[in-house]
Amino acid sequence: MSHMDSHPGRGLADGWLWGIQPRLLLPTVPVSGSRLVWLLLLASLLPSAWPASPLPREEEIVFPEKLNGSVLPGLGAPARLLYRLPAFGETLLLELEKDPGVQVEGLTVQYLGRAPELLGGAEPGTYLTGTINGDPESVASLHWDGGALLGVLQYRGTELHIQPLEGGAPNSAGGPGAHILRRKSPVSGQGPMCNVKAPPGKPSPSPRRAKRFASLSRFVETLVVADDKMAAFHGAGLKRYLLTVMAAAAKAFKHPSIRNPVSLVVTRLVVLGPGEEGPQVGPSAAQTLRSFCAWQRGLNTPDDADPGHFDTAILFTRQDLCGVSTCDTLGMADVGTVCDPARSCAIVEDDGLQSAFTAAHELGHVFSMLHDNSKQCTGLNGPESTSRHVMAPVMAHVDPEEPWSPCSARFITDFLDNGFGHCLLDKPEAPLHLPVTFPGKDYDADRQCQLTFGPDSRHCPQLPPPCAALWCSGHLNGHAMCQTKHSPWADGTPCGPAQACMGGRCLHVDQLQAFNVPQAGGWGPWGSWGDCSRSCGGGVQFSSRDCTRPVPRNGGKYCEGRRTRFRSCNTQDCPTGSALTFREEQCAAYNHRTDLFKNFPGPMDWVPRYTGVAPRDQCKLTCQTRALGYYYVLDPRVADGTPCSPDSSSVCVQGRCIHAGCDRVIGSKKKFDKCMVCGGDGSSCSKQSGSFKKFRYGYNNVVTIPAGATHILVRQQGSPSVRSLYLALKLPDGSYALNGEYTLIPSPTDVVLPGAVSLRYSGATAASETLSGHGPLAEPLTLQVLVAGNPQNARLRYSFFVPRPRPVPSTPRPTPQDWLRRKSQILEILRRRSWAGRK
């Protein structure tokens, strides 16, 4: 399910507080010159009165007017450009000049989209900077292509985004065509806006299974895409910036708190130019995600072994993304889609270096992680785990010691253990090398502010303590102020003489070396065996170990190998009085859950559903109502130790069907013979088979299958279009278990019989009507055939196995020596009696 990620104080953090009241203003402190810095605290804001519309009326179509003459063909862009621009009731005069330090051609990246053309002799891809209305505090940062303008304007505390309108007509003077001018919308202070929910179902695991409950190296081959707004904003520094952000995201995935060896690898970097070749990037985050997901699939190769294949794709954009009700959204992704070529994708609104955590957050969703405050995380996380980890719904500060919550670690582990990460097992051949230095060494505090709040922003140095939160300059109603998004300074940012930031703390540079030396992890000892999942009938118990001797540090290799082991327990038979099977008990537990099925007349009678359930879904609790026949997956997993199917001795373990012998021992090779004797040789039963041809209208008795019969098979063949014969089953008490009272069951179903035995029925409309089951039957069963017309070329055959009668042991005939011995014994007895009579 798509979702919207909201991060704290988006409206205030961007520096614009349009219509947000009340606000708290702290005493001013002096800064350079006569400017004042107003410290605004996000926590002081109450919900604003802004409407809930996802797109307030903050955009209009404008026609920029070029004032300094025409550009002559072949002469390139003039040294200075003047544009007049109407903007929300004001007139803006843009004074622009070429920025010689920005050249997109210097990027060793793939360029897609409409190639820049020499329109009117203008130099394609020219980056311009300048001021607005002569205000030295204003900033204009634009990409200029033959009159088309794309970029950001910051003027008197307002941020404006301008871009060409696709298909827009030129103005009457033949100047630039229509442009969209969008004022970055203020947002409410209502807190989290990310409403991601657990998807109703999981993607199907690949038949290419990984070793169960094992820690295996996973390589997330990633396509990184930047749109034209990113190119306009970052210019020549785009590649380095993107790789720096991805390096920080990869570092988060290397942290041992995720409890899996996951390597985020950039294999391809694409920059989109203006045009219609790329995805449609607009204010709607959901539509942008859908468009990007569809577009990126065309760039991928289906073969996972192909060097050009990627496992997931991320789009970075400077577009202000909006969700359902506000424009707080910083990213969007689908849940649990990492190996789905059509849906393994995410979008991220560039927000400075902290976008690394947004990217990690979105990839966490792709790995099936939910928000730390979700219902599914209750009981897994501690009371403070909903706000200090990567998957927090509102990210203020990520704990560097534990960036991933226990819930996130559990979800990604279960996701990978259940076979959904099959595409991540191949190691990439030619990944792009990510920066290994701390990002703060390349981007100082001033540059971090510019990346987050715009080109005119600078670091506010007067606010202690350093490193904990990055405060940056801005403007509000013409007044200078400081603003923050509560993100710490980037690691490696200088914070004093011979000092630099690390994890939000200011440390001496000598201490940083300890954070730059990788340390591989090692397995700790196996833990004790846990409780058995069943008291009888064959349960499962677990033992696990952790990567704690030592714990990996600084991106060191996480432990590989088996992390969980399991074994069978309590394999003895359950008491004969048990009326329900283990799976039947689990279905019956929902009989009175009327809250889940409010449209059904309650209570319901839920029984297991086997027919029509795919093998990969055998370990889901699929139940159907006995009366209505509707069936649902009531639980994504049955209890450990539940048989995978009535005809199988294999059992479910953590949602996976694991082989077990007929002795209920996991890994055992013992099998039932045709007599359903565990480990038998088939000699204790005999086969009975026959056919039936004496058809007359109504119900006809075919054969009585005795109690104890096994491997029952009944088949009648004939064209369904002319068939007039149908199978039926009658119980000893005269009631029907199948197709009684001239009522047929057309579709496949399981016929549940006394003694927890079931037969699989093909349905009356099947091409070959069949009944089959392993048995043994607990009581006799009468097989009947219902004749509803004139049978033509009908054939009905049946077979089953019945126990052989146990021979009564005969008394062995005595040998001659035995007779002589017994004769002498008898004579001796008679002699003694004779002597006793004489006395």
UniProtKB/Swiss-Prot annotation:
InterPro entries linked: ADAM_Cys-rich, ADAMTS/ADAMTS-like, ADAMTS_ADAMTS-like, ADAMTS_CR_2, ADAMTS_CR_3, ADAMTS_spacer1, MetalloPept_cat_dom_sf, Peptidase_M12B
GO MF annotation: an example: peptidase activity
Domain Disintegrin: from-to ranges: 437-519
Post-translational modification: The precursor is cleaved by a furin endopeptidase.
Disulphide-bonded residues: C293-C345, C322-C327, C339-C423, C377-C407, C449-C472, C460-C482, C467-C501, C495-C506, C532-C569, C536-C574, C547-C559
Lineage: superkingdom: Eukaryota
SMART domains cross-referenced by the UniProt entry: ACR (SM00608), TSP1 (SM00209)
Annotated motif Cysteine switch, positions: 192-199
GO BP term (any one): extracellular matrix organization
Location(s), subcellular: Secreted, Extracellular space, Extracellular matrix
Function: Cleaves aggrecan, a cartilage proteoglycan, at the '392-Glu-|-Ala-393' site and may be involved in its turnover. Also cleaves COMP. May play an important role in the destruction of aggrecan in arthritic diseases.
Domain remark in the UniProt entry: The spacer domain and the TSP type-1 domains are important for a tight interaction with the extracellular matrix. The spacer domain is also required for cleavage of COMP.
Name of protein: A disintegrin and metalloproteinase with thrombospondin motifs 4
Organism: Bos taurus
Gene: ADAMTS4
